[in-house]
Amino acid sequence: MKRVQTAEEREREAKKLRLLEELEDTWLPYLTPKDDEFYQQWQLKYPKLVFREAGSIPEELHKEVPEAFLTLHKHGCLFRDLVRIQGKDVLTPVSRILIGDPGCTYKYLNTRLFTVPWPVKGCTINYTEAEIAAACQTFLKLNDYLQVETIQALEELAIKEKANEDAVPLCMAEFPRAGVGPSCDDEVDLKSRAAYNVTLLNFMDPQKMPYLKEEPYFGMGKMAVSWHHDENLVDRSAVAVYSYSCEGSEDESDDESSFEGRDPDTWHVGFKISWDIETPGLTIPLHQGDCYFMLDDLNATHQHCVLAGSQPRFSSTHRVAECSTGTLDYILQRCQLALQNVLNDSDNGDVSLKSFEPAVLKQGEEIHNEVEFEWLRQFWFQGNRYKICTDWWCEPMTQLEGLWKKMESVTNAVLREVKREGLSVEQRSEILSAVLIPLTMRQNLRKEWHARCQARVVRTLPAQQKPDCRPYWEKDDPSMPLPFDLTDVVSEIRSQLLEARS
């Protein structure tokens, strides 16, 4: 079943088409550090972009972070994600792993990634390898460092804005360390905007990706990651990126004078103002250990892309993920809320309910959908990848599946109730109306997820990475109160509703 684009997606696609039509066969201008106007343009149009050259970052991190990248790569911990774009399942050219606070998730391109936890106090984490544990510890250490640097950068930005000064590109060599500190309230706000709770690690070897797309607006060359805003972040929160390309230092050079535009052998990050065809874009070369920071609302007002070089590259992208609906604690609380309506359980799995109030039933069925499609199916669609690093998610997923199964019994109890003799026509109609939409959505989404697990691209994946259509059961499974395919159930509800209203 083809997913219908959201209004936001349709608007974004329309903007892109209009922009390409305006360009016709011309390229928009962009600047590199060799251009005279580069730093002036950065000063005027990109003042919330902060860059740190590798030489300004502690040598200890430059030793430990690359080792951690290579360790995770050696153990096969990074995976290309199977994402849905415009109704089509495609593998991302970039391999990824999410590391962060235990129980956190991060969603991008309608795909929920689950953290491999970094080692925090009070949480027991069983890693499959001591090397993987050490790597996760390293990224927590990097996270702490980048957090401190981000707060410092935000403080300096606030001082400049308050003084109404012209902002300048904040390269580490000239980065000011003095100044009047912020107020207590401001300090709390700055800390919250740098409270990185996850890092999304990326890896790509361009030699193995010969079909990379060309950058469409400026002619910047091959893109590893297309123009985008980072999704699912706390409003106005910062993003910090540590870049590590695998070439030796002797191969790196800041001399790009022989190239028109950017050096295609060197990785770059590109920036542009969203949907602006007047302001030149920027491309900044990325060498081993360089970092950059997107502060305040830069991620909302500007777009960025990653332009491929010739050598493999890792990056660690630290974010303040918007987790109000994306933590294990959250979804467990939601399950508890839905199951508060259960009066008692019988030995055969049937349940009786406290209330058949339409609002209570509707809420319960919506939570049922949430745990099934935002958690269980998202997790198992990614195969067994998480077990390569840790068993941390095994017990929570078993727990969620048990709670979800009880919700299946709740739905069955509702469907039994509408067939009960003595129920008034009005009550029957209200109950049916309350559950029809969530059950119709459940049926449609089950079809979609089942079809995605059978997609052609899935056949190319190794066994451990193949999507698992879970939960799934056959029609005559005695342990399940309702069928997997709800076509007949939904059809009967519609018929009953028409009958009740006639």
Curated annotation (Swiss-Prot):
Summary of activators and inhibitors of this protein: Activated by ascorbate. Inhibited by N-oxalylglycine, fumarate and succinate.
Keyword list, A-Z: Acetylation, Cytoplasm, Dioxygenase, Iron, Metal-binding, Nucleus, Oxidoreductase
Keyword Transit peptide appears in the UniProt entry: no
A Gene Ontology biological process term: regulation of brown fat cell differentiation
Gene3D superfamilies: Alpha-ketoglutarate-dependent dioxygenase AlkB-like, FTO C-terminal domain
Induction cue: Up-regulated in the hypothalamus after 48 hours fasting.
InterPro entries: AlkB-like_sf (IPR037151), FTO (IPR032868), FTO_C (IPR024366), FTO_C_sf (IPR038413), FTO_cat_dom (IPR024367)
One Gene Ontology CC term in the entry: nuclear speck
Cofactor names: Fe(2+)
Region (Fe2OG dioxygenase domain): 32-324
UniProt note on tissues of expression: Ubiquitous. Highly expressed in teeth and weakly in bone.
N6-acetyllysine carried by residues: 213
Binding site for substrate: 96, 108, 228-231
Entry-linked Pfam families: FTO_CTD (PF12934), FTO_NTD (PF12933)
Binding-site list for Fe cation: 228, 230, 304
EC assignment: 1.14.11.-, 1.14.11.53
Residues holding 2-oxoglutarate: 202, 292, 313-315, 317, 319
Similarity annotation: Belongs to the fto family.
Cited function: RNA demethylase that mediates oxidative demethylation of different RNA species, such as mRNAs, tRNAs and snRNAs, and acts as a regulator of fat mass, adipogenesis and energy homeostasis. Specifically demethylates N(6)-methyladenosine (m6A) RNA, the most prevalent internal modification of messenger RNA (mRNA) in higher eukaryotes. M6A demethylation by FTO affects mRNA expression and stability. Also able to demethylate m6A in U6 small nuclear RNA (snRNA).
Entry's free-text remark on domains: The 3D-structure of the Fe2OG dioxygenase domain is similar to that of the Fe2OG dioxygenase domain found in the bacterial DNA repair dioxygenase alkB and its mammalian orthologs, but sequence similarity is very low. As a consequence, the domain is not detected by protein signature databases.
Stated name of the protein: Alpha-ketoglutarate-dependent dioxygenase FTO
Gene behind the chain: Fto
